[in-house]
Each structure stands twice: as structure tokens, then as C-alpha cells.
Amino acid sequence: MRFYDVRERSKATWQSLSALTGDGLLYALAACFALVLGWTSSQPAQWQWGYLAVGPYALVAMVALVLGRRVLRRENLVRLVLLVVVVVGAVFIPLGLEVQWRHAQPEVGVIQRSGQLLSKGKDPYRAYTTHGRVVNEIPGLPAFESFFPYFPLMSVFGLPSAGTKEAKGLTDARVVMTLMTLLASGFALALLRLSKQRKIRVAQVLIALPTGALFLATGGDDMPILALLLLGVAALQRRQTNLAGISLGLAAAMKLTAWPLAVGALLVVRNEGGRSTWKRLLVWVTSIVAVTTLPFVVRAPGAFISNVFAFPLGLAGVTSPAASALPGHILTTWLPTMGHVLAPVTLLIGGYFLSKYAHRHWPLTLSRLLALLSVSFAVMMCVASATRIGYIIYPLNLALWSSVMQEQRVEEPVLVVV
């Protein structure tokens, strides 16, 4: 009960603040995070972003806090201007400089090499493990960089750099992924039935705050996925099944992290008449995934499974950079067998309780589905044998989308049994 009271009081206090004051606090926290990251990170791309972003965050935080003490007639316009300033200072400038310096997270090189292979008609799933050793390992690089832990469609972000030995300028995969993220998220925000105030908050968390800006400037592979998921959510809210199927299908054809929402959407999708259209959504998603994936599965099924499933789950016998000190990884380090068993057991137990919850609250609303997926993501991230703290952006965004839709009290899709 005490925890519930504290949560409710904190929520009431936050809601009592003006939108600009809330922005100022978020940007101030972002400035602190950027400064700490600059001091503590050992990865050049990350600490450079931290030092570059702390100034814009701090400046905009001060402006927002000062203006938040006044009653402004065009508060949303001021918030939007400050948002643009932050995106320029914490995303575009660091991204441009780091592209010029050629400092990036390892996944950027992995995606660019896959694009080069794809442009030559070759399979991006070159490396695989057999009898405890890596086959076709790329010389001169860590073993984990030989793996391509994505679905084939992710290779398209590496195609612009395919004609050059080294990606430069606009051909850098991060630039392409950032453009894709901005286009998809902009379309989604325009489509969403939310107030301008809520849309700005969604854009802040997705793009402007470190939950988006850090990843866009240094790695970026999860950002197009999140933008497409947001577009899928907007389409579900507006009951546009075809658009929902295309956006969720594209996301699912890039990375496994899109699958929970792509599957969950089947429970809440409906048309303007209120009838369930889950079959049409299923056709779109499965068709896109099948067309882009099956040729590679047929060509080398073992290599595909080794890259897309075994490696991300820590079962490929290769040291992965996805080694954040979360419970699942710690347990796997101490007791490997128990660590690898924990995730599937948690998945089964969690699936049981989720099904009970869904049955009790049937029919599910879109807001409630997003909340369930947010909790599920957070739990699985903690118990997975190979994971990274950066995946927290998935449950954070899903929780925010659920919250703003619930508070907005929009008419949400529910499953209508026919």
C-alpha cells in the first residue's frame, strides 16, 4: 500500500507541473546522463556523444525551466522549438561528427558489411558455429562481429555503403537509419489521435532524449524498429489494418524485437466497422517476413539459425557485447546451465500469467496490450542470458505509448469475436 501511495503521489506531482517544466526536468536529467556517460564510458562513440550532448541538453533545460514558470499562450510551439534544438544538438551534430571520425558501435559495421554482401548477391549469414568453433570468421575482427543477428531486411541500411570500401558521410548506415526513423516516426505522430502535448512527449522519448539520441548517433539499429512499431500502433489506433500490417511486417522482417507487438496486434486490430481484421494483418506480416527471409533460410538454414537465434540468445559459444550485468547474464556466468534455462522457464510462466490476465480483462484494448508488452520486455531483458541495458528503450517507449493513449481516452481497438 505504501508503494502504491508513493506512486500515486509522484504521478500527481508530475501531472501538476506545466508541460515546459516537465520538459526542463527531463532535459536536465538527460544532461546529467550525458555528462556521466562522457566520464565513465570506455567506448569512443558513447563518451564523445556524452560530451557533445551535455551542452545542448543543459541549455534547453534552463530555458524550459525558466519559461515554465510563466503562463505561455503558445506553450506547445515553444516546446516544439526546444525539441528541434535538442534534436539538432544531441542527434544531428554528434551524428555528423562521429560519422566523420568513423566512431561507431560494432553493429554499424556489421550492417554495412551485410549490405556489401547483399549487393554482390551473397548471403549475409556467412559465419556460424559448429562443434564449438566459428566457421568463416572475419579475420582481424572480434568473433562476434562475424555474426549478423538480424533478419535479412536489415541489410538494406548497409546498401548505400556497398560501393565503397569504407562508409563515409551520407552512406554511413547510421545516417540511413536516422532518416528512416525520422520519416516513420513523423508519419506515425501525424497519424496518432493524441493531443499536441502528448505527441511532443512521445517524440522526446523516441528521438530527443538519450533513449533515442544516444542510439541514433552511435548505433541506431533499434531506432527504425521502434519508429515502425510506433507507426503500427498509430495505424491500429486509426483502424488502418493494411498500414498496420505493412509497418509491423517490415519491423518484424528486420529484428526479433518487433515480433511481440506484431503478434500481439492480432488481438486488437479491427476495421472502422468494429470487426476483427486479424487475418488480413496476419497475411501482411507473414508475407513480408516470408518474402524477405525464406530465400536465405533455404540457402543456409543452419547459418541462419546460428546468426538470428543462437547468437542473440548467447547459445553460439561466442563472447557477445550484449553482456550487461543483469540477473540473467550474471546467473549464466556463474551457472551456465541454469542461466540458459531461466529465460525459457520465465517465458513459459510469464506466458501463463499473461494469458490469465488477458482472459480476465477481455477484450484487450490497445493501451492495455502495450502495457503488457512493456512489462514482458522488461522481464525478459532481465532474465535473458545475453542482453544489454540499451534494450530498456523498448519497454520505456511501449509504456509511454500505453500511458498517453490511456490518459487521452481515445477510442481504442478491441477484439470483436465473430
Language-model features: locations:
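Transmembrane helices and adjacent periplasmic/lumenal helix-loop junctions
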Residues: 242, 246-270, 291, 385-391
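A juxtamembrane structural motif centered on a specific transmembrane helix
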Residues: 403-418
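Juxtamembrane helix-loop transition sites at the ends of transmembrane segments
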Residues: 243, 276, 321, 411-414
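Nucleotide-activated chemistry modules centered on ATP-dependent adenylation/adenylyltransferase
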Residues: 84-86, 416-417
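Composition- and surface-driven signal marking solvent-exposed, interaction-prone regions
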Residues: 245-248, 393-396, 410-413
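Primarily membrane-embedded glycan-assembly and transfer machineries that use lipid-linked glycans
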Residues: 1-83, 90-233, 269-392, 396, ...
